């Protein structure tokens, strides 16, 4: 038997060729000294020789079927007996294709075997894995998690009940019976079911009747939330709930501000604390704090400075044009006080600035700030008519509160009641 690709590189042997004894005797000879292959080397092998090229579904190459059967017996052992007519073929040798058809049948690599239950004492072997022995749809459902949230599972269980109410144990039973995936480990998903029942507003707890035996309350589905479960998917509507909560908060804050305003107008006490002042209650959360700054100027010792500032006089004069109750507030002017440009807002000559006069103009202050802060809030503080702080570490009462009221720049300053 000789080799095709040389003495050292041949892999497939060809039977019927002379042995390479002559070439092996002189390993150091150059390649030219070797005898070339003749035409007899490429001739067909004898019929009785074993052919290593085997086909499972047909005869061997270059030999009759009897030689192929002998070679197959040498490699695979004795062939199994032929199956009876109409029966399935063996796992390795498939029957030849019918005459007139093209293609060949391919044998399976492994036959599906039934799953053997693994004993709890010993772990499952390699042949007992579930993905190798998958034989039914139930086995597939045990491996794949259902594409439903826990809220959707609870809603399915409640809607499947005749009375549309179930206890917690019945919800567990429905989920485990409907979805085999949850039959494996019950600790994790049962905790999630309890959390969703407690935290989701769509599920309401109904106490059990006295004549109803058993224990545990019933759980029902809110009728308003039935449309939120579309094909098993729970659609949350958090935006509407947040908007409703914001609306109730704003309404509560408005009523509280009105009560504070009425109490502040009724009592004309100057030494009112800052937490209960009407200017603090009327201050909006999204706008600057002009009432807070006004209150701070009232409690600061720089009261006489208000009388010598023409900008403040012009500011109050612009507020007087927007005031509705100017005729009523005119009667509250005190004798011997200095006029600030707004009817009803009077400053005593002693220099003490009462918060009562500020509370009368606080409503107009808010209206003016809301109308002008959006359009003129981007202007630089360079054009502000109020001077900056020049004293030590203390800030001026006009440093920040009125910077957004830039419409004062375009007004003409009256000289009445002001000291220049």
Swiss-Prot record:
Effect of residue 355 to L: In CFM2; decreased transcription factor activity; does not affect localization to the nucleus
Phosphoserine modifications at: 119, 277, 285, 287
Outcome of substituting residue 147 to T: In CFM2; decreased transcription factor activity; localization to the nucleus but aggregating into granular foci
Function: Transcription factor required for pharyngeal arch development, which is involved in hair, ear, jaw and dental development. May act as a pioneer transcription factor during pharyngeal arch development. Required for epithelial cell differentiation within the epidermis. Acts at multiple stages of otic placode induction: necessary for preplacodal ectoderm to execute an inner ear program. Required for hair follicle stem cell specification. Acts downstream of TBX1 for the formation of the thymus and parathyroid glands from the third pharyngeal pouch.
Compositional bias per record (Low complexity), positions renumbered to this chain: 108-122
CDD domains: FH_FOXI1
Mod. after translation: Phosphorylation promotes the transcription factor activity. Dephosphorylation by protein phosphatase 2A (PP2A) reduces its activity.
Chain span(s) of sequence motif Nuclear localization signal: 235-241
Effect of residue 240 to C: In CFM2; decreased transcription factor activity; decreased localization to the nucleus
Subcellular location: Nucleus
Species per Swiss-Prot/TrEMBL record: Homo sapiens (Human)
Gene for this chain: FOXI3
Effect of residue 199 to F: In CFM2; decreased transcription factor activity; does not affect localization to the nucleus
Keyword Secreted: no
Listed result of changing residue 234 to V: In CFM2; decreased transcription factor activity; localization to the nucleus but aggregating into granular foci
Transcription among keywords: yes
Recorded disease: Craniofacial microsomia 2: A form of craniofacial microsomia, a disorder characterized by a spectrum of craniofacial malformations ranging from isolated microtia with or without aural atresia to underdevelopment of the mandible, maxilla, orbit, facial soft tissue, and/or facial nerve. Most CFM2 patients exhibit isolated unilateral or bilateral grade II/III microtia, with or without atresia, although some patients show only minor external ear defects. Mandibular hypoplasia, micrognathia, and dental anomalies have also been observed.
Biased composition (Polar residues): 294-306
Protein name in the entry: Forkhead box protein I3
DNA-binding annotation, residue ranges on this chain: 145-239
Keywords from the UniProt entry: Developmental protein, Disease variant, DNA-binding, Nucleus, Phosphoprotein, Transcription, Transcription regulation
Domain comment, as recorded: The 9aaTAD motif is a transactivation domain present in a large number of yeast and animal transcription factors.
Molecular function in Gene Ontology: DNA-binding transcription factor activity, RNA polymerase II-specific; RNA polymerase II cis-regulatory region sequence-specific DNA binding
GO cellular component: nucleus
Result, substituting residue 236 to Q: In CFM2; decreased transcription factor activity; decreased localization to the nucleus
GO biological process terms on file: anatomical structure morphogenesis; cell differentiation; epidermal cell fate specification; hair follicle development; odontogenesis of dentin-containing tooth; otic placode development; parathyroid gland development; pharyngeal system development
Pfam family, one: Forkhead
């Amino acid at each position: 038997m000789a080799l095709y690709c040389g003495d050292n590189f041949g892999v497939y042997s060809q039977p019927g060729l002379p042995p390479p004894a002559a070439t092996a005797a002189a390993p150091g000879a150059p390649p030219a000294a070797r005898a070339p292959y003749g035409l007899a080397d490429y001739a067909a092998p004898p019929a009785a020789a074993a052919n290593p090229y085997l086909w499972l579904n047909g005869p061997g190459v270059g030999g009759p079927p009897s030689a192929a059967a002998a070679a197959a017996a040498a490699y695979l052992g004795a062939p199994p007996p032929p199956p009876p007519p109409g029966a399935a073929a063996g796992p390795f040798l498939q029957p030849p294709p019918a005459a007139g058809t093209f293609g060949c049948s391919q044998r399976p690599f492994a036959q599906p075997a039934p799953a053997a239950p693994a004993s709890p004492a010993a772990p499952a072997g390699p042949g007992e894995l579930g993905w190798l022995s998958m034989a039914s749809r139930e086995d597939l459902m045990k491996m794949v998690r259902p594409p439903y949230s826990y809220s959707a599972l609870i809603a399915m269980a409640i809607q499947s009940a005749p009375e549309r109410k179930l206890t917690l144990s019945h919800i567990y039973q429905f989920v485990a019976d409907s979805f085999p995936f949850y039959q494996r480990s019950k600790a994790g998903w049962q905790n999630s079911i309890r959390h969703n029942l407690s935290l989701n507003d769509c599920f309401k707890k109904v106490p059990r009747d006295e004549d109803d035996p058993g224990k545990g309350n019933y759980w029902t589905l809110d009728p308003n939330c039935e449309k939120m479960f579309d094909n098993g998917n729970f659609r949350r509507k958090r935006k509407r709930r947040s908007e409703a909560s914001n609306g109730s908060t704003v309404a509560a804050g408005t009523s509280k501000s009105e009560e504070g305003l009425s109490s502040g107008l009724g009592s004309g006490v100057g030494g009112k604390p800052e937490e209960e002042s009407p200017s603090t209650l009327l201050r909006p959360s999204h706008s600057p704090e002009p009432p807070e700054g006004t209150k701070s100027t009232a409690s600061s010792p720089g009261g006489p400075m208000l009388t010598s500032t023409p900008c403040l006089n012009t500011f109050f004069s612009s507020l007087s044009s927007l005031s509705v109750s100017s005729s009523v507030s005119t009667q509250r002017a005190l004798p011997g006080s200095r006029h600030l440009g707004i009817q009803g807002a009077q400053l005593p000559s002693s220099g003490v600035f009462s918060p009562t006069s500020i509370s009368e103009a606080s409503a107009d202050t808010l209206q003016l700030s809301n109308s002008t802060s959006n359009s003129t809030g981007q202007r630089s503080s360079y054009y502000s008519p109020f001077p900056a702080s020049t004293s030590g570490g203390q800030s001026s009462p006009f440093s920040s509160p009125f910077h957004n009221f830039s419409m004062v720049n375009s007004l003409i300053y009256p000289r009445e009641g002001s000291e220049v």
